[in-house]
Swiss-Prot record:
Full protein name: Oligopeptide transport ATP-binding protein OppF
ABC transporter domain ranges (all copies): 6-251
InterPro entries cross-referenced by the UniProt entry: AAA+_ATPase, ABC_transp_ATP-bind, ABC_transporter-like_ATP-bd, ABC_transporter-like_CS, Oligopep_ABC_C, P-loop_NTPase
Originating gene: oppF
Protein's membrane topology: Peripheral membrane protein
Keyword flag tRNA processing: no
SMART domains the record matches: AAA
A cellular component annotation (GO) from this entry: plasma membrane
PROSITE patterns in the cross-refs: ABC_TRANSPORTER_1, ABC_TRANSPORTER_2
Pfam families from the UniProt entry: ABC_tran, oligo_HPY
């Protein structure tokens, strides 16, 4: 699991030009190992979805590189290169209702990728693939003739998962796949994603703002704040030893089930102006083995004393 499947180097993503230019992501650096679940965590508007959409090619990049299996995939691509990436990289979207064609049957929605890339030889083979995928995500074959509005939110998300996985991808970007779902079905969808990963040897980029969910499913976590990745570490290391003040703030806001402990805990308030980067510029530094933090030299010395 040590092989790097995805690598992001000095990535910047901006929108607009001139005075209206807005930099959504800057200096993003991370890698995703083959077979692991790597999570991007941050508040709404932090840029996490923007990065995910850039990897799959839905957002253009301003500078930097995105590498997939050692090859640069951002920028201009030929049609054959783009098609190859679509085969290998799929996305599960946040809102299952908005991401499914309301006028199409479930059969067509899941089969669309198979049709576009000629991934079957006979109609019988296509039907068998769709039937097997429906069973794998916990849906019935009689659901194939129905339309998305006839399903619950959890069932619609399962359809979205089936649509992505029927392409037999290597890498799946899950953009807050459970945030629009009822609490009662969130665990079911998470368990489904974990099971499918184990069975199909998938690599996940899991985008979320709920740290408790991320802890359950992730191998490593990157914390992003206003377009800047401030900390990257293995899951338990990040939860047990958060270094960046913003990460500490996020973790302190996670609810504790025990009401007595919840009332006693101290919230950490993050103040962005505590960082003085006027002269001493920050960079991503490996402060501990496999634990990276965005800091300048003065902050690194301070953090190391606190370890």
């Amino acid at each position: 699991m040590s092989e790097k499947l995805v690598e992001v180097k000095d990535l910047e993503i901006s929108f607009g030009e001139g005075k209206k230019k807005f930099v959504a992501v800057k200096n993003a650096n991370f890698f995703i190992k083959k077979g692991e679940t790597f999570s991007l965590v941050g508040e709404s508007g932090s840029g996490k979805t923007t990065i995910g959409r850039a990897i799959i090619g839905l957002n253009d990049t301003s500078s930097g590189q995105i590498l997939y299996d050692g090859k640069v995939i951002n920028g201009r691509k030929s049609k054959s290169e783009a098609n190859e990436l679509i085969r290998k990289i799929q996305m599960i979207f946040q809102d299952p209702a908005a991401s499914l064609n309301e006028r199409a049957t479930v059969d067509y929605i899941i089969s669309e990728g198979l049709y576009n890339f000629n991934l079957f030889k006979t109609e019988e083979e296509r039907k068998e693939k769709i039937k097997n995928m429906m069973a794998e995500v916990g849906l019935l074959s009689e659901h194939l003739t129905r339309y998305p509005h006839e399903f619950s939110g959890g069932q619609r998300q399962r359809i979205g998962i089936a649509r992505a996985l029927v392409m037999n991808p290597e890498f799946v970007i899950a953009d807050e796949p459970i945030s629009a779902l009822d609490v009662s079905v969130r665990a079911q969808v998470l368990n489904l994603l974990k099971r499918m990963q184990a069975e199909k040897d998938l690599t996940y980029l899991f985008i979320a703002h709920d740290l408790s969910v991320v802890r359950f499913i992730s191998d490593r976590i990157a914390v992003i704040h206003k377009g800047v990745i401030v900390e990257v570490a293995e899951t338990e290391e990040l939860f047990n030893n958060p270094i960046h003040p913003y990460t500490q703030s996020l973790l302190s806001a996670v609810p504790i089930p025990d009401p007595i402990l919840e009332r006693q805990k101290e919230l950490v308030v993050y103040h962005p102006d505590q960082h003085d980067y006027t002269l001493d510029k920050p960079s991503m530094v490996e402060i501990k083995p496999n634990h990276f933090v965005w800091a300048n030299q003065a902050e690194i010395e301070k953090y190391q004393k606190e370890l």
